[in-house]
């Protein structure tokens, strides 16, 4: 008798995706982050659901309701900090997942890559709206500054901003709609994840060499499930250490001050995972130019398949490209540091140089060095 998992219409889909899926035998731990992102999404949806049961999206009571969750709800503080730090873990895994894709040439699977970029934008939008909900000082001013960027769009900008705000400033209507969208978006993300996997399973996974491995496949279960389980254990350990020992390590102290439209914080800055993009935004003196650079800093990923000039897919055997890749990583870390610094000398010039280097590396230097490597290898 055939196993039910191979015949039942529903189980068959799960089986073909998680059990009998042919997977390259050579994929390293860098391929763990897809499953870790799935776990992160699950944690965020669950903790978010329970938090939503106690949260009120009203400017008068939002801050108080978060305080109530932390003080009066059974293990409410665990839920709140799991959700806040879970977002940080989500972005760490996201950045590593995208970095893996860049290093090993996974962007050659264009459909999977483009759905991934959509997912990145959706997660960033969700995280931004979630940061507004506790209605602290940084929540309010962050929402004001970031939504105000849309006013740089010619002709329709001002009307667009007021339409998003639901009034003439960030107020009750803004908070209510941000809560509604923050609740809805994770389910859209879950649907996009299924599409992402659908496209991935059409082509099969890439591997560190970048060479097709159709002749060397192993079943996903048990080989990669046990490997993923180790990654999950490590990630959950780090998350629990953050939650239980230093839950506010990655947060901003200003967000413990209730939102006050009459008092601007000395340094308005987003959560750490947006600082690199914020630094690029601030490095351009022109408002519209800054907004375009901000969007392009992520959208540039969509150009990766077009900018691939090497005859090899992966960077595994391309030492010169590897040097530029790690320079890009160092540059992004520099931008993250600059994004959290005040707008004064020498941080302004460092931010501008790091922004120029970021775009130069991706658009000019990496494609050129790939052509040079082809020439050196007489290809």
Curated annotation (Swiss-Prot):
Membrane topology, record value: Multi-pass membrane protein
Pfam family, one: Cytochrom_B_C
Subcellular location: Mitochondrion inner membrane
Binding site for a ubiquinone: 201
Keyword Transmembrane set for record: yes
Swiss-Prot/TrEMBL keywords: Electron transport, Heme, Iron, Membrane, Metal-binding, Mitochondrion, Mitochondrion inner membrane, Respiratory chain, Transmembrane, Transmembrane helix, Transport, Ubiquinone
Single Gene Ontology BP annotation: mitochondrial electron transport, ubiquinol to cytochrome c
PROSITE patterns given in the database record: CYTB_CTER, CYTB_NTER
Residue intervals passing through the bilayer: 33-53, 77-98, 113-133, 178-198, 226-246, 288-308, 320-340, 347-367
Signal peptide range: none
InterPro entries (UniProt xref): Cyt_b/b6_C (IPR005798), Cyt_b/b6_C_sf (IPR036150), Cyt_b/b6_N (IPR005797), Cytb/b6-like_sf (IPR027387), Cytochrome_b (IPR030689), Cytochrome_b_C_euk/bac (IPR048260), Cytochrome_b_N_euk/bac (IPR048259), Di-haem_cyt_TM (IPR016174)
Binding residues annotated for heme b b562, in chain numbering: 83, 182
GO molecular function: metal ion binding; ubiquinol-cytochrome-c reductase activity
Cellular component terms per the entry's GO annotation: mitochondrial inner membrane; respiratory chain complex III
Main location: mitochondrion
Cofactors required: heme b
PANTHER family in UniProt: CYTOCHROME B
Other observations noted: Heme 1 (or BL or b562) is low-potential and absorbs at about 562 nm, and heme 2 (or BH or b566) is high-potential and absorbs at about 566 nm.
Functional summary from the UniProt entry: Component of the ubiquinol-cytochrome c reductase complex (complex III or cytochrome b-c1 complex) that is part of the mitochondrial respiratory chain. The b-c1 complex mediates electron transfer from ubiquinol to cytochrome c. Contributes to the generation of a proton gradient across the mitochondrial membrane that is then used for ATP synthesis.
Subunit structure: The cytochrome bc1 complex contains 11 subunits: 3 respiratory subunits (MT-CYB, CYC1 and UQCRFS1), 2 core proteins (UQCRC1 and UQCRC2) and 6 low-molecular weight proteins (UQCRH/QCR6, UQCRB/QCR7, UQCRQ/QCR8, UQCR10/QCR9, UQCR11/QCR10 and a cleavage product of UQCRFS1). This cytochrome bc1 complex then forms a dimer.
UniProt name for this protein: Cytochrome b
Species this chain originates from: Rousettus amplexicaudatus
Gene name for this UniProt entry: MT-CYB
